[in-house]
């Protein structure tokens, strides 16, 4: 729990962002919750943003570029044009201000050309090279656009005194593909998108009804492996295991008629009533099952761990830095099917006291020690203060 009299670091931080960090929906809530951590740890945290330049993305220039390049895709978001516009806007905003560090979250284009004479801390969960062709929506760009994107990434990393990444997967790319200094590159998980962490007593799953409650939580049915999760549920049922499946965040493409399946198309965590519904759903779950096809990190796995819910996902992207096998869940191969997931669930749930409960409790313990807002905040302060002491 946070102490009301916590002594904060005296470092002065500029939180540079082109988005509005007060908006929980911007950047999937990462900027909102990370700003919260910064304010808990540092005395001075000023927001340098949002940027007017971002409006260009939806304005006349973007429409003009789409007309010029027709169906070929030009990624304006990672372009030198945007980087120059950001440079002038942010240098103007920073003029005459004194800070120990500029904190740039997922802001490679914003800082690539920045000349602020203040050490920059860059924080992300991926590099341009990792993203390109990994996600369907981040593919098929013009060669010029790919070249610009890679150069922007390289300049941003070179322009940073400290590089923080949410996964070892991203660190490897930054160091090996972009020449990032390994001595100034650190692993720092992304914070969970929750306003308060449930008391540990509430997450205790000692009492059981004998029904295994599965949770599929995601907005993209196909990319998140919805059909595999559904197959796992049916596989468990065919084995005579009592179970339920809650599908939250999307609607399956085919209608499902099964009394054990509950579909919640959308929950708005900004609304108190729906947040309480989300919380109850998490507290009632035994496993989060998300056989995702592509994932840079997966904040939802950290959220599940905070509720002592083990996660079952795939070995892809940066998931290995948030799910530790046998500690807070398991990562299965991408080709694993529903029956494979059902095997893992059955093994643990059928031996509830000896296998499931220890996994549930170690999920919460791992969360508190490594991926909670408090653990992330402490590690970040340590990294920045050590960086400053090396320079003095």
Question: What name fits each language-model region?
Answer:
Residues 249-287:
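Nucleotide-activated donor-binding/catalytic signature segment of Leloir-type glycosyltransferases, i.e.
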Residues 293:
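Aromatic "clamp/platform" in nucleotide-sugar-dependent glycosyltransferases that forms part
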Residues 310-314, 323:
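Short hydrophobic beta-strand element within catalytic cores of glycosyltransferases
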């Amino acid at each position: 729990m946070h102490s009301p009299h916590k002594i904060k670091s005296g470092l002065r931080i500029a939180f540079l962002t082109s988005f509005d960090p007060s908006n929980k929906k911007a950047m999937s809530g990462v900027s909102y919750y990370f700003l919260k951590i910064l304010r808990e740890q540092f005395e001075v945290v000023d927001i340098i943003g949002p940027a007017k330049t971002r409006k260009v993305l939806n304005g006349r220039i973007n429409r003009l570029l789409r007309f010029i390049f027709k169906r070929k895709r030009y990624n304006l978001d990672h372009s030198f044009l945007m980087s120059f516009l950001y440079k002038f806007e942010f240098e103007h905003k920073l003029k005459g201000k004194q800070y120990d560090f500029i904190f740039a979250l997922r802001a490679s284009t914003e800082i690539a050309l920045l000349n602020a004479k203040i050490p920059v801390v860059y924080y992300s969960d991926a590099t341009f090279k990792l993203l390109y062709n990994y996600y369907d929506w981040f593919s098929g760009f013009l060669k010029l656009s790919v070249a610009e994107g890679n150069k922007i990434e390289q300049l941003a990393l070179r322009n940073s005194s400290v590089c923080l990444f949410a996964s070892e997967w991203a660190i490897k790319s930054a160091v090996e593909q972009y020449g990032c200094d390994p001595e100034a590159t650190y692993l720092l998980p992304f914070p969970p998108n929750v306003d308060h962490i449930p008391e540990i007593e509430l997450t205790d799953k000692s009492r059981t009804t004998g029904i295994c409650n599965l949770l599929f939580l995601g907005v993209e049915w196909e990319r998140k492996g919805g059909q595999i999760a559904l197959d796992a549920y049916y596989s468990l049922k065919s084995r005579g295991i009592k179970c339920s499946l809650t599908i939250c965040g999307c609607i399956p493409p085919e209608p499902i008629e099964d009394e054990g399946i509950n579909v919640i198309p959308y929950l708005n965590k900004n609304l108190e009533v729906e947040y309480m519904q989300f919380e109850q759903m998490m507290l009632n779950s035994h496993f989060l099952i998300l056989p995702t096809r592509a994932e840079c990190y997966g904040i939802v796995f950290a959220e599940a761990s905070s509720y002592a819910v083990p996660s079952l996902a795939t070995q892809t992207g940066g998931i290995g830095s948030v799910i530790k096998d046998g500690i807070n869940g398991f990562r299965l191969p991408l080709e694993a099917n529903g029956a494979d997931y059902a095997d893992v669930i059955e093994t643990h749930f059928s031996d509830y006291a000896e296998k499931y409960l220890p996994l549930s409790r170690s999920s919460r313990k791992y969360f508190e020690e490594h991926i909670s807002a408090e653990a992330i905040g402490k590690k970040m302060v340590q990294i920045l203060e050590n960086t400053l002491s090396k320079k003095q």
